[in-house]
A protein has these predicted regions:
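Hydrophobic transmembrane alpha-helices
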Residues: 1-53
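Mid-bilayer segments of alpha-helical transmembrane spans in multi-pass integral membrane proteins
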Residues: 71, 106-123, 147, 151, ...
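Membrane-interface helix termini and inter-helical loops of multi-pass transporters
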Residues: 122-137
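Alpha-helical transmembrane segments and their cytosolic interface
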Residues: 3, 136-175
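Short helix-perturbing small/polar motifs within transmembrane alpha-helices
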Residues: 79-114, 118
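Hydrophobic alpha-helical transmembrane segments
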Residues: 7-12, 33, 55-59, 75-76, ...
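Interfacial aromatic-anchored transmembrane helix boundaries in multi-pass membrane proteins
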Residues: 22-31, 62-91
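Transmembrane alpha-helical core residues of multi-pass small-molecule transporters
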Residues: 38, 57-65, 81-82, 105-109
Length: 175
């Protein structure tokens, strides 16, 4: 494909992803949902071009989100996991052993989530009350629930990829 087409499609995907990231500061619950959806959009770039191009789009969306988005916690989640995981997923799934795939996916997820927690706590200065329910400090419970959610999220990314390839792609790129 021509480089101009790659740049144009990358710009369109970047724009859509950035709009989702901007909505994190406007719509309640967007802190977690919109970074997920924004990251899923990057799979289109992986499918149409390459992971290299998708990482460029990820970088642009990350930088612009850091500058423009109101919900910095959501931006941290996007930068440290949701933005690059759908791109990395394609590389991990090239491995033959499913058990190794899942092990790597969970290692990546847990390292990223713990990093996001530490960035939020020590750089964004999110107070301990945000991680407290009924007076109990429960980040480990959040991590456990996050691991359950991750299995669902990974499956959703796979379903989105299939939906894009088999239903949406031909409608966008008519030949």
């Amino acid at each position: 494909m021509k480089k101009t087409f790659k740049i144009a499609l990358g710009g369109i995907i970047s724009g859509f992803a950035l709009v989702l990231m901007l909505l994190t500061g406007i719509i309640w619950g967007g802190t977690y949902a919109f970074p997920c959806f924004a990251g899923m959009l990057l799979t289109v770039v992986v499918i149409e071009f390459s992971p290299k191009w998708a990482y460029c789009v990820y970088g642009a969306v990350s930088l612009l989100s850091l500058i423009l988005a109101g919900d910095k916690e959501a931006v941290i989640y996007f930068i440290l996991f949701f933005g690059f995981y759908p791109i990395l997923k394609s590389t991990i799934e090239k491995l033959k052993a499913k058990s190794v795939q899942y092990l790597l996916k969970y290692i990546v997820f847990n390292v990223c989530v713990i990093s996001a927690f530490l960035v939020g706590k020590f750089i964004l200065m999110i107070p301990d009350e945000e991680f407290t329910i009924f007076g109990f400090y429960i980040p480990w419970v959040f991590l456990l629930l996050g691991n359950v959610f991750f299995l669902f999220y990974d499956r959703c990314v796979t379903v989105f990829i299939s939906l894009y390839i088999y239903r949406i792609r031909n409608k966008i790129f008519k030949k």
